[in-house]
């Protein structure tokens, strides 16, 4: 499968190997694509950019966002810094982690120096000194990004918490930055709370792909995401009018929580297990009926899930939540716009039918694209 770029950073829960499954349920031609839990950005980096579509990468991890910004805007400086920083042992790994811990102090020092320049100098002298400080700040951002990258690359499965014992030659991966930098030129990069940006960017023509920390596996992530946060995420997504796709681990709690969504399941090899042949259950959850987009070999009937099979395991009794909310919005618009008639009822809007096949938005006639902006002959293979 030919993609624009590959992830340049190892990341716990990376979806690079799952792209063939997730892209199958992508509706074509959204006007906005958002990843609120950006992580390694495997899906977004692999998508063809499109003038008519805004792509947004978001993550709450400020170090990760800084790395993506530097990869886009300071690629040459970042690669040079990565070649310079030594990295051969646990001691160097721990030293880089210690540097990351004190980044706030270094940022505060730069801010204090800037304030001193503003107070003590004026005119051309002030501007010259401010430019020096701006360059120093950019250099610090690059140094910080390089340190964070090496901590990720040197840790077990990209967790950033424990040192990986395998030999790791950073220079073998630097070529990934070239393509990633070009792809990110067309991407808006944000550092916001996942729920806030979903609320901000939801719309009828939006496609939002969520890859939250997996339930009961939060200890593997560098962010606190308790059970209540999973429930809050579901609450927000259940009220969205855009196309929502969510990836999760297969467990009873998530199946129950998303009982009002369509749920597809499959099994994959488990890279975190030390047992040969170990597999892991995955869910792909949507607020719309995914079947019109999926390739013919997809199974629409609940069955014993073999490794690699994509199976629809749950269909909500109420039908598509997205269609329900779109109809509700249309109903309210008709009701507000229509004049009051002789019968005394304002705006006889269409009756909502939660169990119907949804609004006439052409979903059933659309052809699956893999991904939406790539031709069918690129559907085979994996990244």
Where are these regions (language model features)?
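SAM-dependent nucleic-acid methyltransferase catalytic core
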Residues: 2-18, 28, 72-218, 235, ...
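Short, polar loop motifs at secondary-structure junctions
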Residues: 39-41, 176, 248-252
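Mixed-charge, low-complexity intrinsically disordered regions enriched for alternating acidic
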Residues: 337-383
């Amino acid at each position: 499968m030919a993609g624009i770029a590959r992830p340049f950073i190892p990341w716990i829960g990376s979806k690079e190997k799952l792209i063939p499954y997730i892209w199958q349920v992508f509706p074509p031609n959204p006007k906005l694509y958002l990843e609120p839990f950006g992580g390694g950005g495997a899906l977004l980096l692999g998508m063809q950019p499109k003038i008519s579509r805004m792509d947004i990468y978001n993550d709450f991890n400020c170090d990760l966002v800084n790395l993506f910004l530097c990869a886009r805007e300071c690629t040459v400086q970042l690669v040079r810094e990565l070649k310079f920083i030594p990295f051969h042992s646990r001691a160097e790994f721990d030293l880089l982690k210690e540097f990351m811990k004190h980044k706030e102090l270094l940022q505060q020092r730069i801010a204090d120096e800037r304030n001193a320049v503003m107070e003590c100098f004026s005119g051309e002298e002030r501007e010259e000194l401010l430019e020096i400080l701006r360059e120093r700040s950019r250099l610090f951002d690059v140094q910080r990004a390089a340190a964070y990258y090496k901590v990720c690359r040197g840790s077990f499965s990209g967790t950033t918490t424990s040192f990986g014992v395998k030999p790791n030659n950073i220079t073998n991966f630097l070529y990934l930055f070239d393509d990633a930098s070009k792809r990110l030129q067309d991407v808006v990069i944000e550092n916001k709370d996942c729920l806030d940006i979903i609320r901000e960017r939801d719309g009828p023509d939006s496609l939002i792909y969520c890859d939250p920390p997996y339930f009961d596996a939060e200890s593997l992530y560098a962010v606190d995401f308790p059970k209540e946060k999973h429930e809050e995420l579901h609450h927000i997504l259940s009220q969205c009018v855009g196309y929502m796709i969510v990836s999760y681990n297969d467990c009873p709690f998530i199946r129950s929580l998303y009982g009002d969504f369509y749920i597809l399941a499959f099994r994959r090899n488990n890279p975190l297990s030390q047992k040969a042949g170990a597999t892991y259950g995955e869910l792909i959850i949507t607020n719309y009926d995914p079947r019109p987009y999926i390739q013919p070999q997809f199974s629409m009937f609940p069955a014993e899930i073999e490794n690699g099979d994509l199976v629809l395991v749950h269909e909500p009794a109420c039908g598509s939540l997205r269609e329900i909310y779109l109809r509700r919005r249309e109903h309210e618009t008709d009701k507000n716009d229509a004049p009051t008639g002789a019968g005394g009822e304002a705006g006889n809007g269409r009756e909502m039918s939660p169990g119907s096949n949804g609004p006439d938005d052409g979903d059933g006639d659309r052809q699956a694209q893999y991904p939406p902006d790539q031709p069918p002959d690129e559907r085979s293979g994996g990244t």
